[in-house]
């Protein structure tokens, strides 16, 4: 599941290229001319709320994020990682391991998982 603070309208082309993975994000509202008139947030702090909901369904959650808006999600997850985050975010949130690069992220996910994920 991808939890993003983008908008469906912006994410659509990339999600198509990725084969339509599940993404939870926000929605833009347009006027009769097709111009952006407003936005609708899924809910406040939607990433953390999604993790809480997954926990309520008895799922374990491994999360990765790169910015301030991800930190409440990372704190709610069973395992949370900062992925290629800026140095100031890493310094402010030392409780989250800082991971650099996709191979290191895959290894961190494998190590955090209770399943045997092949390398």
Briefly describe each language-model feature range.
Residues 1-119:
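C-terminal cap/substrate-recognition subdomain and adjoining C-terminal extension
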């Amino acid at each position: 599941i991808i939890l993003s603070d983008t908008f469906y309208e912006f994410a659509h082309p990339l999600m198509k290229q990725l084969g339509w993975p599940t993404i939870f994000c926000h929605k833009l509202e347009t006027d009769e001319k097709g111009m952006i008139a407003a936005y609708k947030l899924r809910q406040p702090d939607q990433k953390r709320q999604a993790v809480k909901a997954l926990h309520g369904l008895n799922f374990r959650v491994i999360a990765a994020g790169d910015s301030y808006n991800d930190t409440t999600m990372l704190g709610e997850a069973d395992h949370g990682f900062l992925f290629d985050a800026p140095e100031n975010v890493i310094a402010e949130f030392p409780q989250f391991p800082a991971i650099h690069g996709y191979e290191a992220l895959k290894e961190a996910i494998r190590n955090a998982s209770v399943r045997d994920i092949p390398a």
